[in-house]
Amino acid sequence: MLSVRNLVKVYPGPVTALQGVSLDIGTGMFGLLGPNGAGKSTFMRILAGVLEPTSGSVTLDGRDVLADPNALWSVLGYLPQDFGFFPHLSGQAMLEYLLELKGIATGKETRKLAASLLERVNLAYAAKRKVKEYSGGMRQRLGIAQAVAGDPRLIIVDEPTAGLDPEERHRFYRILAELAERRTVLLSTHIVEDVAVLCPRFAVIRNGQVVAETSPGEARRMLAGSIFEGAVATGDLAALQAAKRVTQAVLVEGRNRVRIHEPSREAPPGFEAAIPTLEDAYFVLMHGRPNATNGAGSTVPSDARVPGVTPIVSDGEVVR
């Protein structure tokens, strides 16, 4: 169990990047979903031991990992958003170097383990190819190969599918799903599909604060009967957005197919009831009604006050 309590990070400025984040994460895949600048990478870097928090605690199976970063690295696999590979090395040589650097293997065992890891992420065919010749998806898979070296109990992956084409993304999904079968995998992303496909549970982070923790199914169920869809002329879209909560708008043959969230559960003229999607739920969780408070003056999404959707905190001035 990974337990995070009241994690705060303040950068010089001062800029508060995290404001009291608390989460309990068990075995399997857990998603941290939020927009760019929400604090995801700061959170992940602290958990990975490469950034010190201002305050708060992080324990893994009861062990204080912030107090002993070296112990953390023995059980951690980390794939940051921008992983620094040596472009002139082959994939095989890159993994061999990392395995020896981390003290996982030496000599012939290093070559054998590197080859096994490349096979695991479907890169054996490119073992001798230079990393600079790898596609974005291949580089991500190489990153996962180094992250799982040593069979870590905790794997942290930060924005792993950003920039990948659909084929590479789904190939990466399969690899991550296999990894989560017997260990804790924490995934940060701004892509709703990542969470929908991979994560039994996830948290939504906004402005350095977790606004809700839930599952994809629970998040969709909280909107039952309150999502409606209709066609709107482009010239009328701005007025609709000013009057209603527009969760999605897609231009189709000159008209906008628009989805709205209507808390009254009454369909506006020209709209029909629609099945809620996780994209709808994410929008609602990110834009809570300002008249709902958590008792401390902060607003929370009132729509999240249903069984299975735990409002944590929201609102605050943060940029990371």
Task: Show where each model-derived region lies.
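Non-catalytic surface loops within mature trypsin-like serine protease
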Residues: 27, 125, 234, 262-264, ...
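A generic structural signal for secondary-structure junctions
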Residues: 77, 103, 224, 286-287
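A structural signal for well-ordered alpha-helical scaffolds and beta->alpha junctions
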Residues: 111, 233, 275-279
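C-terminal coupling/interaction segments
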Residues: 252-320
